[in-house]
């Protein structure tokens, strides 16, 4: 804290000490007097914050006021002042204190003093601080104990580096500070390595990205801890009291210092507001806090973006800037501390670049001034030379300082467009270098459309990264699919991506697939226009241009078809194949879709979704090879699959006439949706089912491929009231996630229902026979009397799901062909949803004849084909309105109540 700031704090003091001490002397209860003083401090500082006072005065001012309160509390007890000192450590030791931050104290004792002799004073002092609601963290150590613990734990050593005496013998503090900062405790090298390791672990916990949708102001990359790490190392190695001192050592420029200071003050302001508005120590920008903070800082919704998205965009941009500085300065420190004594090994790459002790470096400082294209060339060289460990700090700074050269002329320079395409075609390092280009601010300038999506959040649960971070992850996933370790999890994608004739077209499509977001309108259409223009500017051929633009425009087509449509229907496959046009388009689209889903939110990818995607790909590929002019005839398809199933049944000795008689009672949908093997197994089990009063339940896995498949539960029973409600409610109680429901009603009053389920962890059920038998028996017991089906389990709905709950929408229409009412339900996904919908149907005596279950992100789009008690579509308009209203009301109310 500067002398000027200290003087300003004294002049704007909140608590008048003489008056405060007089009030304490006169009071019967000192605790209430202390509490009132602290409340006065909180209220006054909060008012000043709301009125726009300099955040530094507030953060330092709070620590300064609390110092005075603690000193007075200390003086109420008897201490041997020459043998004890009260030390402020950590953030409080720096003189910084946010509204709800911990107040970390060290009671430092002379080695000749035993803590037991001060037990009453220590206990009374700390109890007083807790009683007056100060959030105090404390430790009591002798000088030697303190030194030994600091040697063993870098966190304790760091806390002592940032420490100051509040009251007591300051010489004790000076002595321990000298010992802890000596080479005997931690050498500069050891300390730097420990802080690097600490930061790496901290970043790993936050997915190594600044762009988490609920970032931590302290611990996420680009957060306050990254700035503090710079300060700790600077203080330990360079003796710098402030980061400003690094300017004198030529480690930081004045411009960089200004950016660092502004970034820190911004994070301080957000953290102060977060503590104040939440009323607790909170450093996570949780979704509900983001909205409150956006409103507090004056952001307003616009047509293009929500207020919360604007607020978070600013946060992300500042975080990425601070993270970039952290990288650069730690690289500087690495060179100054770890590599200072290394032999300087320099290997020229060309006239502009060289490798300096394993790191890329410009050959001379004015390289970018004389050869602006070198700003692009640097990343190509890094990709072409994977043994290079990174970029020298001085070169990172030069790249930053010369970014202004990336202008329209730069973008139109054939050397730069050629270099960028060379990077896209590089066999190694594409993902790493595109990410590095983004980090150093080059990509957003080279592709202005990409620059506009940097830091743009998507305020939902479907996307867990910002648009730019997601885009970089899609490119990374496309790269990873080439590697052998991904062959088992993604066999088709792995094979395809290694056979694509021009892999660079896939990367370009990935780069542009979401680039149109945030502008209003269809982002796929907008992105396709940008992608086509890019391809022209980079001199790609006509076919290549059209392929890339088509991929961007249709990047959602395959996932939407697989998730929302009945891909067992030959008409659906033919329509999709017509849109895709040829196998090469299909191959590119399949890989892009797989990468997109996995880079959007890894929890979205499960074994069932993998199965759907594989089936859509293989069926479409078969249709394309057969020729679009030769679509599959449904009758031919049904006849073929019946022949195959009948062949299997004959081998088992099943009477053909009995089979055909049974099949005559079943509609065509069953034979279009099921495989010959499934039809054979179902038919055999039904014909051999002797306990006709009880439901027949069969459980099988849909695939034995690793990472694919789900568990199918087939139920054959009398078609009676509440069957659907009882089934889904029982499955909910068994913690089964229903992915798909195929409901077929026979002409003889029975139902053939097939439910595709996953376990709670989104994998097929265990093949443990005891577990499967338990599930089977539970279903038989409950469905034997579906009138008395189990209650719906009340499960806790995740906090984020409640925050992003959008109103349920229900659409009803009558299908004249099937003579059924179609009920479409669009609602936020949550545990027990189908069970609740089934209960509503049951109360209205509706029978579910067919259902299509589809989860799209955090929402479901489910279709139910129902009939009334007379097996007819709902004809009463008033009943339709009442049903629509009741579904919306019950689902929305229960989402908030659970």
Predicted segments, located by residue:
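Active-site-adjacent "gating/activation" loops or surface patches in catalytic cores
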Residues: 87, 94-103, 347-362, 370, ...
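Hydrophobic alpha-helical scaffolding
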Residues: 115, 166, 181-189, 213, ...
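Non-catalytic interface/linker regions that flank or bridge core catalytic/transmembrane domains
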Residues: 1-89, 95-97, 101-463
